[in-house]
Amino acid sequence: MEFSVKSGSPEKQRSACIVVGVYEPRRLSGIAEQLDKISEGYISNLLRRGDLEGKPGQMLLLHHVPNVLSERVLLVGCGKERELDERQYKQIITKTISTLNETGSMEAVCFLTELHVKGRDTYWKVRQAVETTQASLYSFDALKTRKGETRRPLRKMVFNVPTRKELTIGERAVEHGMAVSAGMHLCRDVANMPPNICNPAYLASQARQMAETHDKLKVTTIGEEQMAKLGMNSYLAVGRGSSNESIMTVMEYKGAVDSADKPIVLVGKGLTFDSGGISLKPGEAMDEMKYDMGGAAGVIGAMKALCEMNLPINVIGILAGCENMPSGNSYRPGDILTTMSGQTVEVLNTDAEGRLVLCDVLTYVERFEPELVIDTATLTGACVIALGKHASGLFSSHNPLAHELLNAGEQSGDRAWRMPLWEEYQDMLDSPFADMTNLGGRPAGSITAACFLSRFTKKYNWAHLDVAGTAWNSGANKGSTGRPVPILSQFLINRSGVEISE
């Protein structure tokens, strides 16, 4: 898919289709008024006849509008003027792309980016249009023998900006939107891959493939033998029941002018399949536990976006690849593990395994002397109960970092909600036999999981994103969402100091 930006009048556009907005009730947007004027009232006559009310998402495709150079004009309902919000805007873009694909238009000039969206600027509107378009066109059919094909798929979109001075802003928005979309695409592809293909070695191979095409990226892998030497006993215990080797993949991106600048570290939980281990999960929907590597998929996707944007910062991404399976060699409830940090953990439930993998990785990253560390994981079902499918859970021991991530979520539309990390919750992890348990009980499950992780992050500023509710969808639209790539990518853009404002 090719994207570009222009600034110009609709009557001068020669394209397969022009896309313009209509407000409710039957009010033409400024661009639609220009088309109506040159067509001598053709469009307003149709609206007076009741062909389109202007409700959000309504579509009316016109052919051969008088005096208009383009073959088609697509009128898009945008709701009431000045009330268009970001959610409606993205829904309208999605519906527009679907309609354009059905018409067989291979290219279109879209003026929806000139609409007023509450609290949003040109950069946001263009970038979200790119990302929403790419997301709506995504399909995972790599393993299908019969692939569905659009008659004449949309290949080129031109987004219009109001003035020529905004062209540079629009071009930057397209650049960033394409990069984030590429990251989301990779995230979704890796996460949607079945667990008999996507194991820890596969995760590592995807990272190595990326390094082959990006000079600033170096990838190394750490297998079980080296983990044992490092004392990563907690991580190793989780993978003991699987015939697939646990592999930690380290992706080092050096983009800063000073290569010695402290790196930002992103850690992704990479349980390529989580059966629960000896504490076996119920059979219903267990197939979706291939998505328990959603954190690692988000990190590799964010690293892809980072490489595409060529941001001037140093970032390390870690994919904590592992598989939690039951066997005679599996770790058990009642086991006491000595973590890489030296702290001991009593295992109460082998299905609370993500934190046992992450705690050793969070200790391992101390060697990088990081500027900050963000881990992302499909960690707890409790977070899904608390926040549903719309917001990721955010926990942090550092207020400025938490505020940065919340802001990045609002900017990108990949929002998070901060949860408490109060000292009172730590008592729920007490064990009579070890320094802590790996389970705090049913109440406040996502909070006690984050409290557990916080005990391994004392040497740097840290935040934890629980994406259990946001990394994938179930039901009819089953599949990876591509989150948390947008929030992580936006955070890195903000940290890099790249100018994006008008």
From Swiss-Prot:
It is an enzyme of class 3 (hydrolase). It comes from the Bacteria. One of its GO terms (cellular component) is cytoplasm. Binds 2 manganese ions per subunit. SUPFAM superfamilies: Macro domain-like, Zn-dependent exopeptidases. Its EC number is 3.4.11.1, 3.4.11.10. Its main location: cytoplasm. Its cofactor is Mn(2+). Keywords: Aminopeptidase, Cytoplasm, Hydrolase, Manganese, Metal-binding, Protease. It catalyses: Release of an N-terminal amino acid, Xaa-|-Yaa-, in which Xaa is preferably Leu, but may be other amino acids including Pro although not Arg or Lys, and Yaa may be Pro. Amino acid amides and methyl esters are also readily hydrolyzed, but rates on arylamides are exceedingly low; Release of an N-terminal amino acid, preferentially leucine, but not glutamic or aspartic acids. GO terms for molecular function: manganese ion binding; metalloaminopeptidase activity. Presumably involved in the processing and regular turnover of intracellular proteins. Catalyzes the removal of unsubstituted N-terminal amino acids from various peptides. This is Probable cytosol aminopeptidase. The gene is pepA.
